Regions:
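Conserved tyrosine-mediated DNA breakage-rejoining catalytic core shared by Y-recombinases
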Residues: 232-290
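Short, Arg/Lys-rich segments that mark the N-terminal edge of DNA/RNA- and chromatin-recognition modules
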Residues: 1-44, 248
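Short, polar N-cap/turn motifs at the start of nucleic acid-interacting alpha helices
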Residues: 236-243, 359-378
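Short, basic (Lys/Arg/His-rich) helix/loop patches that form interaction surfaces
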Residues: 145, 201-212, 272, 288-303, ...
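Basic/aromatic-enriched alpha-helical hairpins
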Residues: 69-75, 86-142, 158-161
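Short, aromatic/basic-rich helix-turn unit that serves as a nucleic-acid recognition element
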Residues: 12, 35-39, 46-52, 83-111, ...
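DNA/chromatin major-groove-contacting recognition/catalytic segments
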Residues: 255-260, 357, 378, 382-397
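Basic, Lys/Arg- and aromatic-enriched nucleic-acid-binding interface segment
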Residues: 149, 164, 168-232, 240, ...
Length: 397
């Protein structure tokens, strides 16, 4: 009968186990893919003391138990050792055809992962507590709740790929961020009808800002995203059918300059109905466009909203415009100031106004270009005391 192998303490070693001359234990095995692998440990069992000067790590028998479980579950022993950065890069490579804005967000997250200790960790060692600590570090660095939540969503998607590929069993990013970090995102508030009229009246009569009256009116009466408004050309206004055709947006970056992009989602491609007031505003815009050299971007020209040099305006131009405009208004109306207003505030106001008038949700979803009806339905939940009063009066009259 063949004598069983023993370690330096006289203990019988199991199949695949051995002990080197320096005292370190070794386990040889074949993984789920037929590859020969080795693991090492200074301790044979969990109760063995760690040799002096050596790091505290799992014993060989603990490693064997994990290996057997991985083999039984078909876990990829190589794949689980990839770092979080490598996993995120793998996910991005599988979905390479994305918008430039999405690509910039990806680059930001990859840069953050490389700067953070979590990025170099192998994915099989990342626990929910590690993911939560990462979120807290992002908060300490000054990132907003929404930014952290978006990055968390991306990493959660990455781990689902790892689960599907049998690299890990669980998703450490499958938790609610609001349980870790307070959601301090300010609720977007629509302008009241009085504020809307006050803004329009001020712009119309102001000697500086009157030239932007039509821009603001069109935003208020169409609910367009600011990048969609900036991208409008003469050909996009269909006066015969009284609609504006939305099939692109105009953006600008430091790296690339001006560029044309498709709408935010497929639902963003739409035709927005125009009121008589809005049609007249578009006609005035066309009439007062400065005569300048043709400016063509990605094959599109004759942009409607341009500066004095004939170059198209972009979102940042309007953002700064609204800051200055509201500041001047509030300087002369200290008793009844306007809130902080952005171009998106006007889109929010347009949607809220139609929702409060009980427009068919599916029709409003189409006009707004929302990809999901749940986004549209949120606006119907934004009741105010004024709309509540009118509804009560209507129902009990």
């Amino acid at each position: 009968m063949k004598e069983k192998r023993r370690d330096s303490k006289g203990r019988i070693l199991h199949t695949g186990e051995s002990q080197r001359t320096d005292g370190k234990y070794l386990y040889k095995y074949v993984d789920a893919f037929g590859n020969t692998k080795y693991v090492y440990a200074w301790r044979l069992t969990p109760t063995d003391p760690t040799p002096k000067g050596k790091r505290e790590k799992p014993s060989l028998r603990e490693l064997e138990q994990q290996i057997r479980r991985d083999i039984e579950d078909g876990i990829d022993s190589t794949g689980k050792k990839m770092t979080l950065c490598q996993l995120y890069a793998k996910q991005n490579a599988q979905r390479a055809n994305v918008k430039k804005s999405t690509q910039k967000q990806r680059e930001q997250l990859m840069r953050l992962l490389k700067e953070d200790k979590l990025g170099a960790r192998s994915i099989d060692t990342i626990k929910p507590s590690d993911a939560k600590e990462w979120a807290l570090r992002m908060k300490d660095k000054g990132f907003s709740y929404n930014t952290i939540n978006n990055h968390k969503r991306s990493l959660k998607a990455s781990f689902y790929i790892a689960i599907q590929d049998d690299c890990v069993r669980k998703n450490p990013f499958n938790f609610k961020l609001s349980e870790i970090i307070e959601n301090d995102t300010k609720e977007k508030v629509a302008l009241t009808e009085e504020q809307e009229q006050a803004l329009l009246s001020f712009i119309k009569t102001d000697n500086v800002y009157h030239k932007y009256y039509d821009d603001v009116l069109i935003l208020l009466k169409t609910g367009l995203r600011i990048s969609e408004l900036c991208g409008l050309t003469v050909a996009d206004i269909d006066f015969k059918n009284e609609v504006v055709v939305i099939d692109h947006q105009l953006l600008k970056s430091k790296e690339q300059g001006y560029y044309i992009e498709t709408p935010k989602t497929k639902s963003g491609i739409r035709q927005v109905p125009l009121s008589r007031e809005t049609i007249q505003a578009f006609q005035r815009v066309m009439k007062k466009r400065p005569k300048a050299e043709p400016f063509v971007i990605d094959g599109r020209g004759n942009f409607l909203f341009v500066n004095h040099k004939g170059k198209p305006k972009v979102a940042i131009d309007y953002n700064m415009l609204f800051v200055r405009m509201v500041k001047k208004y509030n300087k002369h109306h200290k008793d009844n100031p306007l809130p902080h207003i952005t171009p998106h505030t006007l889109r929010h106001t347009f949607c809220t106004r139609l929702a409060s008038k009980n427009m068919n949700p599916k029709d409003l979803q189409y006009i707004m270009g929302h990809s999901n009806i749940s986004i549209t339905m949120n606006w119907y939940a934004h009741a105010s005391i004024d709309t509540a009063k009118s509804e009560v009066q209507r129902l009990i009259a």
